[in-house]
């Protein structure tokens, strides 16, 4: 990196600046993946994908002009792997958001996995597109979450009750 003296005259100064921010904030974003969920998690995956794709492109461009090709090759491989992972997670996030938009206006900001009940929308934890709903006299629970007056269940942006995906046991034990 150069100093600020030749910043305006350097033709690739903007690329160097973006790369510096990319290298600095990528570990912070990766840690934020552990502590975030929902819409923030999806947006973080999109940011990390853009970050990794820029870093990969810059490293492959510089690779052919550098003398230390091993380090750049390893960095490009790591950026490529993180980019592929973030792309798949971003794709899941975008498709679930689009499915929720297709359900109607009131579902646009809803969680991807939720239960619609008499009291409103309740977020549930679901592994994949599976949930287990149990109705007993006096209560209904979905994946261990008590739900007053179950109306419908949405998993991954799709209504699950109408599709027969949910195990609904009436008066189970």
From Swiss-Prot:
Intravirion side: 33-39, 91-173
UniProt keyword Disulfide bond, yes or no: yes
Record field: transmembrane: 12-32, 40-60, 70-90
Function, in words: Major envelope protein.
Stretches assigned to the Virion surface side: 1-11, 61-69
Membrane topology per record: Multi-pass membrane protein
Name of this chain's protein: Membrane protein
Classification via InterPro entries: Arteri_GP5
Subunit-level organization: Heterodimer with the membrane protein; disulfide-linked. This heterodimerization is required for transport to the Golgi complex.
One GO cellular component, as annotated: virion membrane
Location, primary (coarse class): virion
Superkingdom field: Viruses
Subcellular location: Virion membrane; Host membrane
Family named by the database record: Belongs to the arteriviridae membrane protein family.
One Pfam family cited in the UniProt record for this chain: Arteri_Gl
Alphabetically ordered keywords of this record: Disulfide bond, Host membrane, Membrane, Transmembrane, Transmembrane helix, Viral envelope protein, Virion
